[in-house]
Amino acid sequence: TTTVQVFEETTGLKPGETVTASGDALSVTLGPGILNNIFDGIERPLSEIAKQSGKYISRGLTVDSLDTEKKWDVHVTVSEGEELMGGAIIAETQETRSIVHKSMVPPDVNGTVIWAAKDGKYTILDPIVKLKLEDGTEKEITLAQKWPIRVPRPTLKRYPASVPLITGQRILDT
């Protein structure tokens, strides 16, 4: 028995249909540009979808969550020879006037920097750092990461809230 969670129209789907797994858990892309967008529940950028298909989402429309062609001003914060572990900040990007996006090494990656890009303009898919991992392999790190939505981001310490975040917005979900 298999349970399927769907996010689109299911007309034509019936028991016994062949299912092809993607091999990946439902994931989001984390990187520069995430704060300048409005997404639906599965990280589809609604403004880009509206540009391509109008007010209604066309069947089969595929849009990248984050703009893969936009070049961001990137300040690289690491240099060759540094030992990095998961969560280390490798680059900073001014995403909005008040928010600096910090790109990090994925949590499960540790290694030595063997190459680092110079400060400049890069897309979220351009390599920013190349690490030599403990097993001798090399891994390129970009400004963006895919992250499974059901896996919490690891933290060293959780700080309790001392002051409530008051936004002035009232949200009802019934």
Describe the predicted segments one by one:
Residues Q5-T10, G23-D24, G41-I42, D67-E80, ...:
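A structural micro-motif recognizing beta-strand termini
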Residues I49-P107, T123-T174:
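P-loop NTPase nucleotide-binding/switch module
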